[in-house]
Amino acid sequence: MALYREGKAAMAADGTVTGTGTKWQSSLSLIRPGATIMFLSSPIQMAVVNKVVSDTEIKAITTNGAVVASTDYAILLSDSLTVDGLAQDVAETLRYYQSQETVIADAVEFFKEFDFESLQNLANQIKADSEASESSAAAAAASESKAKTSEDNAKSSENAAKNSEVAAETTRDQIQQIIDNAGDQSTLVVLAQPDGFDSIGRVSSFAALRNLKPKKSGQHVLLTSYYDGWAAENKMPTGGGEFISSIGTATDDGGYIAAGPGYYWTRVVNNNSFTAEDFGCKTTATPPPNFNVLPAELFDNTAMMQAAFNLAISKSFKLNLSTGTYYFESSDTLRITGPIHIEGRPGTVFYHNPSNKANPKTDAFMNISGCSMGRISSINCFSNSYLGKGINFDRSVGDNRKLVLEHVYVDTFRWGFYVGEPECINQIEFHSCRAQSNYFQGIFIESFKEGQQYGHSAPVHFFNTICNGNGPTSFALGATYKTTKNEYIKVMDSVNDVGCQAYFQGLSNVQYIGGQLSGHGSPRNTSLATITQCNSFIIYGTDLEDINGFTTDGTAITTDNIDTIESNYLKDISGAAIVVSSCLGFKIDSPHIFKINTLSTIKLMNNTYNYEIGGFTPDEALKYNVWDANGLATNRISGVIHPRLVNSQLGINSVAFDNMSNKLDVSSLIHNETSQIIGLIPSTGSNVPHTRIMWSNGAMYSSTDLNNGFRLNYLSNHNEPLTPMHLYNEFSVSEFGGSVTESNALDEIKYIFIQTTYANSGDGRFIIQALDASGSVLSSNWYSPQSFNSTFPISGFVRFDVPTGAKKIRYGFVNSANYTGSLRSHFMSGFAYNKRFFLKIYAVYNDLGRYGQFEPPYSVAIDRFRVGDNTTQMPSIPASSATDVAGVNEVINSLLASLKANGFMSS
């Protein structure tokens, strides 16, 4: 309906509309805020009237910054098309005419008292005077004419006044007839009553609605906005809508029900959908916040958002969230206790800044319990100081329906997505979600019952979900965090997990499809993902990126802050990209690998079986093993391995087995074409060909097993004159040693290579001696990490030349400068060119050292010595000999004599 189109109008970019030939404030123009002004330009531009300033100026909003030159226009009043809008227009018209009745009546009374007889007498006197004197005839005639004109004008004015009075009375009678014909309950009748606005019509705020008493049930009222003052703030009204009255009592929930004494109003919900603003929630346009600077307009939405959640659950309504930032200052948790559908927008942000940081270890920002089905989409959750859990899943209902999280982003909590109770998983799907920059794990999902060996949860599926940049900071294991105890350390038999990106325990039918597991920007973690006691776990097409391995010195973890972990467990702190422990059914295929700098890309351990590994696509050379099987029992080996690493740049090993059970039938373990293994090439610049397969302690039982499994197919058939075999082993304090099952006379071995993974100061020395059959020393040397030179470009290697006639090799790692700290980060290993040759890795602690010797053809004799309770240090190499290589034999012999004399070594 066009209300006004006189003149022309132009609009500036700030929404100022200027009129030419307009009278926008005239009484019957009916222009008011909310009307639509349409400019008949090309293209047509539209805006909403916010304020009528004058006859020639209007302030408009929602203009999109458009600039319109002076043109024809039309002002529309959209709500005139409704009964209530039409009623308001008619009422204003009626009030106008009623306001004019007094003016019209005054005019009528004036002309009623006008002295027409005196006017006539005056005319007659003028005529008589004219006849008496001809000289004044012309003047008299003129006077008579003027008098006659005045008489006629007066008569016309009287008639006009009469007509106006009749017209006003007729209009009033017609409008009254319309009102009378509409019936007693019409909007017009109610508006015409003195208390009409109080009974029905439009109310400005939810608070005012509570005080608006209806006359009976079933009355309607329009709520303009949840809060007053929206126009003054130059904002659009939010939270408004239609309400219906009821006589009785109900609980006021702050959005759906507005209750007063003996009555209440119920919101009309269209399409089973409502907004958080219907409950008084507010957003700001502030972008994702600076954690140290809070905006001045901070508004705590906790109670209102919880009420909105409750309505969505109880009525099965969809809750719509707006673009903008919702702030939450209360430490209370937002709780979802049933099926729910929440839909945000790409710019929807939840920012958690609790004033009372009660218990960050257990508190959650959002807790989902009893939610067997539903969908939560497009929410970005932030916290200001790594508080509690982002979204916590707690005791889901056990049926076959599922909960879907879609485009949900969790950032800067302690944990991102967290499930920490048994039997609370029920078909959860994560679609395009992200957990980033959380203090511990981005994804921590554990559905584990004591005594349950493998996962028993309902399916958990991840599709294109990103988990990156999470994990503890470099000081997270220090004394500052004594109160955290074991909250981020998980011990899995012989490996501990410190701050991985994602942790899964006790799950069934898990799929991680696409997406990313990455350590982007995070301090070093042990792994990207740790998977333990799961059943049927699949990783497919996922980016595995950017991890260096956690390198914190073992002294950072003490019994003061972690009182249930023995220090000797902390030995795998270089980690792996993916750690799989005690799983029944594991498959990883087609991952994209980039910047992986851990001991292993995939580490299988502790009775993991029914696994399949393959399809790797590395972007660059891997530093160490592609995958590593550690301690897999004989009856658990049923994997199929398809590396498909043709011409890929790998690290030291493509496949590594460590601590395998004896009598392993290795021929049934790897089902692969030879070409898929031997196409590997070493990293650029390396003079030493990389190992194809790495074995260690207990891996091979006899030469028959060795020949059947690998020797012919994988170590000797590549037409390379030198194919090294890398020997590697890890020790705990209580168990070390082993036997060599295949070796060759030392006079056939030309070189021994010694490697370290840590370049420390000269506090430690690796010593090595070559002895003849009588035990006489033929050659000896020692090496500090600083001695490792660039002779062989592989970082951390030195070469020891084996002299002719050598029958025994003695080696060890000893303290050389009364070092009282820990040397846990020292790892020593060795291999020999052309022949299979076994050495151990040694990690020397401040209270424990090892000294070993190798004597072909079939045994390794390992002796250990221990200095009790950290009170006595290992015998030190004299300072005068610390850099005197020529005196190494005397030093070693003196050291051996001291060790034997103190009972630390056998004879």
Curated annotation (Swiss-Prot):
Gene3D superfamilies: 6.10.140.1630. Functions as a receptor binding protein (RBP) and probably mediates the attachment to the host capsular exopolysaccharides. Displays a depolymerase activity that specifically degrades the K2-type polysaccharides of Klebsiella pneumoniae capsule, which allows the phage to reach the host cell membrane and bind the entry receptor. Homotrimer. The keyword Aminoacyl-tRNA synthetase does not apply. It comes from Klebsiella phage B1 (Bacteriophage B1). GO terms for biological process: adhesion receptor-mediated virion attachment to host cell; symbiont entry into host cell via disruption of host cell envelope; symbiont entry into host cell via disruption of host cell glycocalyx. The N-terminus contains an extended triple helical bundle. The central part is a beta-helical domain, which forms a negatively charged cavity at the interface between neighboring monomers. This cavity may contain the active site. The C-terminus is formed by 3 four-stranded beta-sandwich folds. Keywords: Degradation of host capsule during virus entry, Degradation of host cell envelope components during virus entry, Host-virus interaction, Viral attachment to host adhesion receptor, Viral attachment to host cell, Viral tail fiber protein, Viral tail protein, Virion, Virus entry into host cell. Residues 145-155 have a biased composition (Basic and acidic residues). It is found in: Virion. Residues 137-169 are annotated as: Disordered. Its main location: virion. In the N-terminal section; belongs to the Webervirus depolymerase family. One of its GO terms (cellular component) is virus tail, fiber. This is Depolymerase, capsule K2-specific.
